[in-house]
A protein has these predicted regions:
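Cytosolic, long alpha-helical scaffolding segments
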Residues: 1-144
Length: 144
């Protein structure tokens, strides 16, 4: 019997997955920093809608990682990955709509600059969640 613990997946995959998880938290922090640095006094309704999608993405990532702990027997990994990808697509659409609205309806250049950055980083949060899901999918494929 081996006396050392051998993880069910490669170390490189664990490192890659943990880096993508860390990126999610970094991107969320980046949104908050943009709000603070831009001195945004009120939150735009479009930002609230995008934030709701980011929260849903993060919740699905949490569910995915919980299911991933026993990925060989998990029945809902594929569904969670699909849901995260769909949420990221929703985020892309909201991003485009928000940016269009910002650039066509707003006349204050400072407001445009601040909210452009915030929208970009909200969208990057959803992208980061999708990267976690893609990495989980890749690891499952390699180890099934």
């Amino acid at each position: 019997l081996a006396k050392e613990f051998i993880p069910p997946i490669e170390r490189e995959d664990i490192v890659e997955l943990s880096q993508h998880i860390d990126t999610v938290t970094d991107k969320v922090e980046d949104v908050l920093l943009r709000i603070y640095m831009g001195n945004a006094q009120e939150i735009e309704p479009d930002a609230l809608e995008m934030t709701d999608v980011v929260i849903q993405c993060c919740e699905k990532v949490r569910e995915l990682l919980t299911a991933f702990a026993d990925f060989r027997r998990s029945k809902n990994l594929k569904d969670l990955i699909i849901q995260i990808n769909a949420l990221e697509e929703t985020s892309d659409k909201l991003f485009m709509q928000s940016m269009r609205k910002l650039h066509t309806e707003c006349t204050d250049p400072l407001h445009i600059i601040v909210w452009r950055e915030i929208y970009i980083y909200l969208e990057r949060c959803a992208d980061a969640c999708e990267h976690v899901a893609d990495t989980v999918e890749s690891v499952v494929m390699k180890n099934s």
